[in-house]
């Protein structure tokens, strides 16, 4: 007899699996391969690289790798040809048991960019396992009283294969008493068994030896067999019968040991020992069931014995056998199916699959940083996992596909603000109560050179005394770069430019690493008062970033120049001046005037005059103005006074220590009468008024024409130079509306003034003249240019004797002495509040931009008011003289329009300045002997102006 069966339930599962595959596979997007089990090492599985659309050359650079939750050594990929091959023995039964489907799930991961592919390799079953019985021999005890068609259960064979390979066909050796019976329902309540076809007779046949052979459906067929030893017994002809043939129980997982699962009950119609039933597990029960459950042999209670885990096994099938105590025991059988209910007892599991660290701070938003896989062994809502990040991080999670998240950049990074982030990923399932797990990763932000070196302030002011030693350290600049490593390494350098005819690098240098600024040569205040330059700071990044800082180096004056006497007339040198004075002059008559200039500035250039006693002079006869240098009589002269007076005038500055020079004035007293070279003012006023007016008009016209021509020529030359040369930054100082002045007592600022310096491309800046302006504009259209007081040899140049204002005024104005007097002396530390008299202009009220220096504070009273902008609307006509004149040595403003007896103007009261007088002299020299008298009158006017 032959019967083919694989259990009805397994047949249904197999059919459903085939239908599911037929429907699902066309829509599946992942790669699918199929290989038989027990394939040899190196067996070709598939060209995985080609199927995934990857080039062979990019497998290694993109870090092609294969990961598997199953045994990772079963399959391998050859990176040289992209072929997936069998790496080790694959036993389907070991890998998947009796599951209808068996697949190896692979995850193929490549970087740059990050990609994940799913590969499923189906392991096909082959007929490599023969069917086997639990034992090689089965003993059966059958009472002879058993009726025909009685069913005697047999333990069936098992085949580890599946499908057709597991379809078993049983065959019983030929006999007269028994036949094989297959199950009558799909739940396998009745399994394989023997059916009694002929009544037994113990006396005739006490024992029967049968062979049960099983054959599977594979190709080739494999067989197994068991020997059946049937012993014919007597009496006890009723076997135990269970209340139900099938018990179904639901049991939560994680229940404690001893928990009652179910109680089975079987009854036996026999009496006595033949009716007492003992319960036990069937002999063919799996060891796993024996480890998890225990049955009480008397009561039939089944209790939990081991750890019940839903994730390990979702259901248990227990075969229970009830045997009576008769001499010929009879048995009954039932089945208990324990269905394990899942509870939320597993927290989610997190794993970082791939990390791309560190991340550059300029990475674009959306950059993938890591791939995170999540897994929860629970089912249903207990296994539904959601992931989130800790707040305040510039990242977010993006669900790419089931159970996978990508950690991507959500906002811009700034390493200088935050150098690294600790990212904590929280995975939480949907159970109640919910379980959660965390995984953290430290994301380091790589620096990018996005910050230039920064100085604490855009400009620094440095004060350095002149005559410094070469290589002196004058300042240190420092810039800070917020970047790191080589992007924060700052080096310093000069922004090269020309200072006059020389390069800036010949004056100063900067140390590339420390930022120290050194003066390469001694600085001279008289040559260069302000040195303005820029220092550049650049980092070592690629590309390098940099910034500049401006340094204004003010060279402070030291008293290193002695006063220098100005020669009053050509041909007279050695500091000796000769003058003729009539004995008829009265007290206060100005005999001579000593003029000196000091190349220094401030108090170092503030000159004072003192008359020293010497042999042959009467000190009480003359006196000298303390700050004007004017020598005047103290009384009327008489016959008793010596005809020759030798005066020694000591000129010294106010430096510390003070420097001085001595001038000698020889005064000759003559009797009353006309002087050869110095006619009196009264006579000159009476006799030469008309000629003076004519000469003045002519000279004024000539001077105006000459100055206009010179101005046009200068503008043309300046325009040509500006068009042909690259403009460079002026060395005359910063275009700031604040002037910083230096002196022996310190430095200060004078607001609402602008210092005008005359710059030349060939010579050092001119420093003889300074103008003041109420305007804060940077216009330099009005620049005054005067000759330098010293030549290249260092000796004082001979000044133009026609300048009719004191050289000490020029030095004082250049060094802002009037500012010292108006500021420091007025409210200086430790000194009284002094009010210095001020010489005003000829205008009724000062105009805008008009500044007058104080009188008597080291500034000559012949100083004139500098202004630009509209002047006095009242302009003198041709031949007219100004209404007021500044008397040397006096703070008063004296009108010089004094009407004489004949209503004529005395030319000697008019003091000329600068080029007008020089033009007049040149004109007179051209006239020769014909205009000798006019020349003498002009010289007389000059002498009177000096006085």
Swiss-Prot record:
Record protein name field: Protocadherin alpha-4
Listed GO MF terms: calcium ion binding; identical protein binding
Residues annotated as domain Cadherin: 30-133, 134-242, 243-350, 351-455, 456-565, 573-681
Location in or out of the cell: Cell membrane
Glycosylation-annotated residues: 257, 265, 548
PROSITE patterns xref list: CADHERIN_1, CADHERIN_2
Disulfide linkage: 96-102
PXXP repeat start-end pairs: 734-737, 774-777, 796-799, 829-832, 870-873, 888-891
Extracellular topological domain: 30-697
Job of this protein: Calcium-dependent cell-adhesion protein involved in cells self-recognition and non-self discrimination. Thereby, it is involved in the establishment and maintenance of specific neuronal connections in the brain.
Topology versus the membrane: Single-pass type I membrane protein
